[in-house]
Design a protein with these regions (language model features):
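Iron-sulfur cluster-binding cysteine motifs and their immediate structural context
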Residues: 173-174, 179-185, 203-260
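Extended, hydrophobic alpha-helical segments in both membrane/secreted and soluble proteins
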Residues: 39, 43-50, 56-82, 86-89, ...
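Active-site cofactor/cluster-binding pocket
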Residues: 108-111, 115-116, 121-124, 251, ...
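Short acidic, glycine/serine/threonine-rich loops at helix termini
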Residues: 11-13, 21, 27-33, 71-75, ...
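Thiamine diphosphate
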Residues: 1-167, 260, 267, 284, ...
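Glycine/aspartate-rich loop-and-adjacent alpha/beta segment that forms the canonical ThDP
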Residues: 142-149, 155-213
Length: 423
């Protein structure tokens, strides 16, 4: 939700792009006229060898700021030296986003990038951003740099593809995951503004999803059919969705989300002492679980769910509980390509001693317990292969979370019944 790649990887009709590594690689799976990729630091260089043997006059090449700082500038230098016609789209999202949001290896900002590529002979250079007014008047840009709003990206690209030689677009928009983390630490501006959808007006056309490519725009089933709603807990306030031609969107400024009441509590959410005491009594009344015997063999737990919802945290809590109880444990988190929004599996193995744990991964048919935080991930091929008939017990969350397929297909239906039947 709110990822800058949602907009930055688009290309105008009649053009194509070459993929970069990391998050840029995922554009290959999307309908973004993007093909081929290279190792880190060679983004776009395939065009150097291809250009003389095709009638195609121009391509775009995607590259991230982390890759650019590491070795990507060398690829741009090679392209400029070969005098091919191409435009590098350098995404400055202010983080090494895919691997955990680390900072760059050294100091880097859009102005520095502009001066470096200009020194290599790249021109023109256009900065495209969601906040054109954020740059101080004395920003040390390379000569001739212009700044445009991201709403003009299509027009900027149409202009660039007519330019001879190597040109560059520096797309400046902070990584959505990093925005979220920094806002929690009060280290990034958090506008008092939210977009909501009036379901009575919404016709369920899905144009908001087309414009934003955002997973926070979710289906809402009503008596009048499927509508749209914005999941405010996952929204990162990108506001690309409001650019659609739709009267159902309402922008609320200055308001705050209403916090749900706690069970037995009052409007302040604090609850009364009596209610808290009652909750503690109910918790004590719960039957104690039957703990598995770890004397003979390890106990395998597989936690499945969606990245960013606490799957890894659940695995860590189980491991720490085993450690506190004096047992051995291991945890292996399989978070895939992206840390948020994708399938995540946490392999937890518990044993009487370290000598009994021969592998950190739960083997084929070796799961004694599956904690399915998301039913679709629990029914995936990888997760199913860890389950064994007569051995595995599964506890699965029935709440349905839309997938990326809904963004492309407004009539997409969640395969919940099929997933449960498979399990």
């Amino acid at each position: 939700s709110g990822c800058p790649h949602n907009t930055s990887t688009r290309v105008p009709e009649g053009s194509r792009a070459l993929a970069g590594i990391g998050c840029h690689y995922m554009a290959l799976w999307m309908d973004r006229s993007t093909a081929t990729f290279t190792h880190m630091g060679a983004e776009g260089t395939t065009w150097i060898g291809e250009a003389p043997f095709t009638e195609e006059k121009h391509v775009f090449a995607n590259i991230g700021d982390g890759t650019y700082y590491h070795s990507g500038l060398l690829a741009i230098r090679a392209a400029a030296a070969s005098k091919v016609n191409m435009t590098y789209k350098i995404l400055f999202n202010d983080a090494v986003a895919m691997t955990g949001g680390q900072t760059h290896d050294g100091p880097l900002d859009p102005a520095t990038i502009s001066r470096q590529v200009a020194a290599e002979g790249v021109k023109p250079i256009v900065v495209v951003t969601d906040e054109p007014d954020k740059y101080p008047p004395n920003t040390d840009w390379a000569p001739g740099v212009t700044i445009r709003h991201r709403s003009e990206l299509d027009q900027v690209q149409r202009e660039m593809r007519e330019v001879k030689g190597v040109s560059a677009i520096i797309y400046d928009q902070t990584c959505a995951s990093e925005k979220r983390r920094r806002r929690k630490r009060n280290a990034y501006p958090d506008p008092a503004k939210r977009a909501v959808i009036n379901e009575a007006v919404c016709e369920g056309c899905g144009d908001c999803s087309v414009k934003s490519n955002c997973l926070s725009v979710e289906p809402l089933e009503t008596e009048f059919g499927r509508k749209r709603t914005i999941n405010q807990s996952t929204c990162n306030k990108d506001f690309s969705c409001v650019t659609g031609f739709c009267p159902s969107f309402v922008t609320v400024e200055g308001g705050q989300l209403k916090k749900p009441k706690k069970a037995g509590g009052n409007d302040s959410g604090k609850g009364s002492a009596a209610a808290k005491a009652s909750a503690m009594e109910r918790a004590k009344a719960l039957p104690q679980p039957t703990l598995p015997s770890l004397a003979e063999q390890p106990y395998g737990v597989l936690v499945t769910g969606i990245g960013g919802t606490g799957v890894v945290t659940v695995g860590q809590i189980l491991a720490m509980a085993a450690h506190v109880a004096g047992q051995a444990c291991s945890v292996l988190d399989m978070s895939g390509l992206a840390q948020k929004g994708g399938p995540v599996l946490s392999h937890v193995r518990l044993a009487h001693s370290d000598e009994h744990i021969f592998s950190t991964r739960v083997g084929t048919g070796g799961a004694d317990l599956v904690i399915g935080c998301d039913v679709l991930v629990a029914a995936s091929k990888d997760a199913l292969s860890r389950m064994g008939a007569g051995r595995t017990h599964a506890v699965v969350n029935a709440t349905l979370a839309p997938t990326a397929a809904f963004v492309k297909n407004p009539d997409w239906a969640y395969p919940d019944a099929a997933s449960v039947a498979t399990l």
